[in-house]
């Protein structure tokens, strides 16, 4: 995780093979968005390692940039995930787990499809990854500083293909995300809680 607004977090210690190594982030060595992005990236890795521990994408390298001097957005590009500072009514996007999961999801989509697809496929697939990990249909809850409830998108929706396509990838992506969300809810309803 690289801090674009100042020195990046620094931690040193001795790692011994075969023994878990604890990285103790504190406010003294890192700022909040650095810690939150680091934690969220590791959460995505754990989520997918539980599904497929040897999946090649998880063995790769992903770089994160936080506190970019822009506001109200985040993005994935070329094996990097990038998060903007707070401002203009928006929170620091590196401090919103759902946004971090979503941007990481673009890397997964690119790995599987080779690009982000068309008609919002990359956005919808990235949203549903965040939905699965957070367990809620809202993407980016807390994105707007004056509204910590609705977030930026909701995968629990009634949008349908092709009639609800409007050409905006974030809107159109809600169609496939809605399909996945509804399917996941039905699957969960049919399984015992422990599964």
Locations of regions flagged by a protein language model:
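Post-HExxH zinc-binding segment in Zn-dependent metallohydrolases
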Residues: 119-161
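Surface-exposed patches in mature extracellular/periplasmic domains of secreted proteins
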Residues: 52-66, 115-121, 137-145, 191-195
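Active-site-proximal alpha-helical
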Residues: 152-195
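Active-site recognition of the HExxH zinc-binding catalytic motif
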Residues: 98-111, 123-127, 131
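Short pre-active-site segment immediately N-terminal to the catalytic Zn-binding motif
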Residues: 35, 83-100, 113-117
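Acidic/polar low-complexity interaction segments
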Residues: 1-50, 54-62, 66-88, 110, ...
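Catalytic cores of large soluble enzymes that bind and process phosphate-bearing ligands
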Residues: 29-36, 92, 121, 168, ...
């Amino acid at each position: 995780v690289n801090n674009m607004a100042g020195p990046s977090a620094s931690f040193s210690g001795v790692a011994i093979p075969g023994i878990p190594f604890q990285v103790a982030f504190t406010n003294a060595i890192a700022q909040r968005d650095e810690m939150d992005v680091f934690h969220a990236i590791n959460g995505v890795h754990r989520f997918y390692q539980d599904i497929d521990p040897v999946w090649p994408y998880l063995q790769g390298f992903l770089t994160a940039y936080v506190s970019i001097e822009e506001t109200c957005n985040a993005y994935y590009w070329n094996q990097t995930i990038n998060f903007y500072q707070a401002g203009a009514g928006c929170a620091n996007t590196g401090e919103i787990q759902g946004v971090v999961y979503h941007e990481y999801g673009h890397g997964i989509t690119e790995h599987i499809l080779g690009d982000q697809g068309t008609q919002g496929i990359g956005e919808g697939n990235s949203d549903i990854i965040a939905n699965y990990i957070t367990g809620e249909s809202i993407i980016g809850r807390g994105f707007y500083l004056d509204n910590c409830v609705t977030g930026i998108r909701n995968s629990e929706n009634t949008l349908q293909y092709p009639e609800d396509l409007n050409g905006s990838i974030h809107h159109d992506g809600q169609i496939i995300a809605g399909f996945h969300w509804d399917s996941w809810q039905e699957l969960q309803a049919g399984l015992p809680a422990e599964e």
